């Protein structure tokens, strides 16, 4: 029996390889097939309290992504030069920020140690930002971010969402989700968490900046956040018990089948 490892599948981005080869496929998101099992996202939960004091923080942290210059895989995300749209998105977002907020803007580029042959998005915006606003230490920066702007719907977006005020700024045609998440995506848009227009995202941030908590803690946004963590990233409190009970049940099932064969 094959059990694939837990995956976020970028919150439901189309990917059925594990389901096709596995008896069970462990996922952070809600089950999308009969062999899916939703399990708590241990990697994400450790970020839950790192921005609990977000209203007292002052930075705007934008997090970018990279892809290789030449395609290596068939993926449902930006491939090769498609990633360059980010440059325009970053510049447009920054241009539409209120002048008094621009000094708080930081850009976290994708680690070159991981993607050494990418398009170096950070180098492409050096004319826009001084070096002190181009940062490399993600964990240090997110702890000081009042709002995080994530340019891609992957693990980093989940970490930002669970920790405090977050905006996802992405290009829908390059990030394909299953229709199972249409309702959630529409609600994220209405709650001003998800944007595909950089200028609109910046204008929203300008509007809520002085009282971010009024937006983030509003009834509508809290409802959408709860739905998000129910459907896209399991964040149940008793995560260790859930994992323990699941593993014990699988072990018991394995040995029971073994005993049945030997009987």
Regions found by a protein language model. Give the residues of each.
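C-terminal alpha-helical cap of glycosyltransferases
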Residues: 230-263
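Catalytic binding pocket for nucleotide-activated donors in carbohydrate/polymer assembly enzymes
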Residues: 37-38, 55, 123-126, 146-147, ...
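Active-site donor-binding acidic/aromatic loop of nucleotide-activated sugar
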Residues: 127-136
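Active-site and donor-binding regions of nucleotide-sugar-utilizing enzymes
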Residues: 1-44, 157
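Conserved catalytic-core segment of nucleotide-activated headgroup transferases in glycan assembly
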Residues: 42-127
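Short, charged/polar "capping" segments at the starts of alpha-helices
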Residues: 6-9, 32-36, 70-71, 113-122, ...
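Structural alpha-helical scaffold elements that stabilize or flank donor/cofactor-binding regions
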Residues: 18, 140-142, 187
């Amino acid at each position: 029996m094959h059990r694939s490892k837990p995956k976020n599948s970028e919150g439901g981005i189309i990917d059925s390889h594990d389901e096709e080869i596995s008896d069970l496929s462990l996922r952070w998101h809600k089950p999308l097939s009969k062999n899916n099992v939703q399990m708590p996202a241990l990697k994400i939960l450790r970020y839950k309290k790192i921005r609990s004091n977000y209203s007292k923080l002052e930075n705007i942290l934008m997090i970018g992504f990279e892809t290789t210059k030449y395609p290596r895989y068939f993926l449902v995300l930006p491939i090769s030069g498609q990633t360059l749209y980010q440059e325009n998105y970053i510049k447009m977002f920054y241009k539409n920020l209120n002048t008094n907020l621009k000094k708080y803007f930081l850009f976290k580029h994708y680690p070159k140690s991981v993607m050494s042959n990418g398009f170096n998005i950070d180098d492409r915006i050096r004319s826009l930002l001084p070096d002190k606003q181009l940062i490399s230490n993600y964990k240090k920066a997110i702890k000081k971010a009042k709002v995080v702007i994530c340019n891609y719907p992957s693990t980093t977006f989940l970490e930002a969402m669970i920790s405090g005020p977050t905006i996802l700024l992405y290009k829908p045609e390059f990030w394909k989700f299953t229709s199972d998440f249409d309702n959630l995506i529409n609600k994220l848009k209405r709650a001003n968490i998800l944007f595909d227009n950089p200028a609109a995202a910046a204008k929203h941030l300008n509007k809520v900046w002085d009282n971010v908590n009024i937006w983030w803690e509003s009834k509508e946004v809290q409802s959408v956040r709860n739905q998000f963590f129910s459907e896209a990233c399991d964040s149940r409190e008793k995560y260790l018990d859930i994992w323990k009970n699941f593993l014990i049940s699988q072990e018991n099932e394995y040995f029971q089948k073994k005993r049945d064969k030997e009987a």
